C-alpha cells in the first residue's frame, strides 16, 4: 500500500549498482528500512544526494505487510539544510548523532513525540550560528527520556557518587561493580542536566571536560542498551571544539 510520510536519515548502505538501503526514523512507523532506487537520470523521482546524515525526507513508499524493506517511489527534502553540510563542526555532530540514533533507536512503531524531538533538535542545530559546542551532550541527555533511560536525579547531595548501572546518585561508592563516576564528576553531571539548547552556551567547558561528559554518556547508553557497539564517529567528535 502506497503511503506518504516524513523521515530522518540515520544510515545508508549500497545494495547494488542502482539501489541503496536507507534506515530512517519516520513519523508514521518509527525506525524503518527502505530500498531506494538511485538512477543516474537528472529527472529521476529519487536522488541519492537527498540521503545525507540527519536529512529530512518527505517520501512515498510501498508499505507491504510482512516486508522487511519498503520500496521508495518518490522522495524530496522537506527542510533543506542551510549550514549543517557546510560547517565541519556541525557535519561531524550530524554524522555522530545519526550513527548514535541508528544504533540506539530500534522501535519499529509510531512515536510522534520522539520524531518531533528529533526534528526540532536538528533544525535548531542547523539554524544556530554560535554557541552550539554542547549541543550533542544536551541532545543525548534529553534523548534518554524517550528511550526510558533518564536517570534519577532527584536525590542528589554534594559528595554523592553516580551509579551508572542503577542510574541514580548514591552517598556510598558502589561495591558490586565499577560502573560509577566519582563525586566531582557526578556534580558536573547534575549541572549538565540543567542545560537546554537556549542556555547551554552559558556553561563553559574545556574540550577535555566535554570529551569526558561524552564518554560518560556513551558508557551509560552502552550499559543500558543491548548490543550497543563502539561508535566509529565518536573519536572524531571528541577532537572538536578545542
Curated annotation (Swiss-Prot):
It holds the Pfam family RecO_C. GO terms for biological process: DNA recombination; double-strand break repair. Disulfide bonds: none annotated. Signal peptide: none annotated. The keyword DNA damage applies. One of its GO terms (cellular component) is bacterial nucleoid. InterPro entries: ARFGAP/RecO, DNA_rep/recomb_RecO_N, NA-bd_OB-fold, RecO. The keyword tRNA processing does not apply. Keywords: DNA damage, DNA recombination, DNA repair. PANTHER family: DNA REPAIR PROTEIN RECO (PTHR33991:SF1). Belongs to the RecO family. NCBIfam families: reco. HAMAP family: RecO. Involved in DNA repair and RecF pathway recombination. This is DNA repair protein RecO. It comes from Bacteroides thetaiotaomicron (strain ATCC 29148 / DSM 2079 / JCM 5827 / CCUG 10774 / NCTC 10582 / VPI-5482 / E50). The gene is recO.
Amino acid at each position: 500500500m502506497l503511503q506518504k510520510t516524513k523521515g530522518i536519515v540515520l544510515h545508508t548502505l549500497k545494495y547494488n549498482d542502482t539501489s541503496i538501503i536507507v534506515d530512517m526514523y519516520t513519523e508514521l512507523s518509527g525506525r524503518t528500512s527502505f530500498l531506494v532506487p538511485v538512477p543516474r537520470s537528472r529527472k529521476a523521482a529519487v536522488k541519492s544526494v537527498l540521503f545525507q546524515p540527519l536529512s529530512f525526507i518527505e517520501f512515498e513508499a510501498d508499505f507491504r505487510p510482512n516486508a522487511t524493506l519498503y520500496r521508495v517511489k518518490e522522495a524530496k527534502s522537506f527542510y533543506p539544510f542551510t549550514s549543517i553540510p557546510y560547517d565541519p563542526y556541525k557535519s561531524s555532530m550530524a554524522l555522530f548523532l545519526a550513527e548514535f540514533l541508528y544504533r540506539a533507536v530500534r522501535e519499529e512503531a509510531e512515536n510522534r513525540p520522539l520524531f518531533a524531538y528529533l526534528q526540532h533538535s536538528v533544525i535548531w542545530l542547523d539554524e544556530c550560528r554560535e554557541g552550539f559546542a554542547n549541543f550533542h551532550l544536551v541532545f543525548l541527555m534529553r534523548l534518554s527520556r524517550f528511550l526510558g533511560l533518564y536517570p534519577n536525579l532527584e536525590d542528589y547531595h554534594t559528595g554523592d557518587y553516580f551509579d551508572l548501572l542503577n542510574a541514580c546518585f548514591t552517598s556510598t561508592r558502589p561495591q558490586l561493580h565499577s560502573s560509577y563516576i566519582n563525586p566531582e564528576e557526578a556534580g558536573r553531571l547534575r549541572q549538565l542536566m540543567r542545560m537546554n539548547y537556549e542556555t547551554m552556551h552559558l556553561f563553559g567547558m574545556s574540550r577535555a571536560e566535554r570529551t569526558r561528559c561524552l564518554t560518560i554518556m556513551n558508557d551509560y547508553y552502552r550499559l543500558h542498551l543491548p548490543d550497543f557497539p563502539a561508535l566509529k564517529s565518536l573519536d572524531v567528535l571528541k577532537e572538536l571544539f578545542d
